[in-house]
Amino acid sequence: MTTILAIETSCDETAAAVIENGDTIRSNVVATQMESHARFGGVVPEIASRHHVEVVTAVVEEALEKAKVTYQDLTAVAVTEGPGLVGALLVGIHAAKAIAFAHGLPLIGVHHIAGHIYANQLVAKLQFPLLALVVSGGHTELIYMEKDGQFQVIGQTRDDAVGEAYDKVARALALPYPGGPNVEQLADTAEATLDLPRSWLEKDSYDFSFSGLKSAVLNRLNNDKQRGIVTDRAALAKGFQESVVDVLVAKTVRAQAQFNVKQVVLAGGVAANKGLRKALTEAFANKDVTLLVPPLSLCTDNAAMIGACAHSMWLRGIAGNMAMNARPGLPLSSF
C-alpha cells in the first residue's frame, strides 16, 4: 500500500491531499484565494505567493488530520514542480522539501497538467492508449498517451487558452472574475444566440485558436455601442460558448477516430463547464469509447490529482531529489 501526501501551489489555490494506492482520496483540502484576486480581474502573482506562505502549513496539517495519518504513515511526498507561477510553485516545493527532509521521505515532482489528466484515475482506471482534452486557464491541449507516463501533445492553442479567452470575454461583458462560470451562467439565460465564427485552422490540424473569437465578441460590443444598440449580452455569451465547445468537441472526436483510442478523458478547470461536458458526452454516446469526466471538485486545481499522478510515477520508479526547483515553463513533452 502507498500513502502519498501531495501539495499543489502552482497558481492561486493552496492545496494538500492524502492519496492511497493512487485511486483513493483520504483527504483533499483546498484553500482558495478567489476573493483576493477578484477585484483585480485575475491572479496577481505576488499576492498568490504571499497567501500560499500564510496557509500552506495549516492546509497540510488539515489534510493529514482529515486522513487520520501521520508523517510516519507516508510513503512519499509529492508536489507540483511546474508549470505555473514561479513564486507560487516555490512555496509548495519548499514545504514539500522540508517535510521530505525532516521525515526521510522520497520527494516526487509532478507536472501540473499530468496531474489534471490523472485526476481521472480517481474516477476510474485509466486505459491506455487514451486521448486527453486538457482545458484550463493557461492550457488548451489534446494529448495522446500511448502508455502510462508517455505524453504526446498533438494539438495546442496558438494564442489564448480557452480559460483565458473566457476571462477576457467576461471582462468585456462586465462580468466578475472568474470568467468561466460567469459567462456560462449568463449564457444559460439566453433566449437566442448570436452566431460567432469558429476557428478550425488547417484541415488536418488539432491546434486551437481563440483570439479571433475573442476579437469577434469585442467587435460586436464596440459596433453595437457606436450604433446605439443595446447588445444582447446573454445571446453573445451563448454564441461565444457554443463556438468554443463546437471546436473543442469536433477536434477531440476527430483525434479519437484517427488514433483509435477507446478512452477519452476530460481534464482541467474548464472541464467544469456544463455545456462542454454535455457536448462531449453526446458526441461519444454511440461510439465504442469510454469518456471519463472528473467531478467538479477535481476539475479545478487540487492536490488529489497530484497525488494520483505521483503514485503512477512511484510505481515506475520515478522520484526527485532535494535539488528540485520550480520550473514555471515545464513542457509536458519533457516530463
Curated annotation (Swiss-Prot):
**Record GO cellular component, one term:** cytoplasm
Per the UniProt record, one Pfam family is TsaD
Q: Name one GO molecular function term.
A: N(6)-L-threonylcarbamoyladenine synthase activity
Query: Of which family is this protein a member?
Result: Belongs to the KAE1 / TsaD family.
Q: What does this protein do?
A: Required for the formation of a threonylcarbamoyl group on adenosine at position 37 (t(6)A37) in tRNAs that read codons beginning with adenine. Is involved in the transfer of the threonylcarbamoyl moiety of threonylcarbamoyl-AMP (TC-AMP) to the N6 group of A37, together with TsaE and TsaB. TsaD likely plays a direct catalytic role in this reaction.
Record field: catalytic activity: L-threonylcarbamoyladenylate + adenosine(37) in tRNA = N(6)-L-threonylcarbamoyladenosine(37) in tRNA + AMP + H(+)
Location (main, coarse): cytoplasm
* Species for this entry: Shouchella clausii (strain KSM-K16)
User: In the UniProt record, does the keyword Thylakoid occur?
Assistant: no
Q: Where does substrate bind?
A: V134, V135, S136, G137, G138, D167, G180, N273
**Biological process annotations from GO:** tRNA threonylcarbamoyladenosine modification
According to the record, the segments passing through the membrane are none
Needed co-factor(s): Fe(2+)
InterPro entries in the cross-refs: ATPase_NBD (IPR043129), Gcp-like_dom (IPR000905), KAE1/TsaD (IPR017861), Peptidase_M22_CS (IPR017860), TsaD (IPR022450)
Taxonomic path: Bacteria, Bacillati, Bacillota, Bacilli, Bacillales
Could you tell me where this protein is found in the cell? Cytoplasm
Q: What is this protein called?
A: tRNA N6-adenosine threonylcarbamoyltransferase
Name the EC number(s): 2.3.1.234
Q: How is the cofactor bound?
A: Binds 1 Fe(2+) ion per subunit.
Source organism superkingdom: Bacteria
Binding locations of Fe cation: H112, H116, D301
Q: Which PROSITE patterns match?
A: GLYCOPROTEASE (PS01016)
Q: What keywords tag this UniProt record?
A: Acyltransferase, Cytoplasm, Iron, Metal-binding, Transferase, tRNA processing
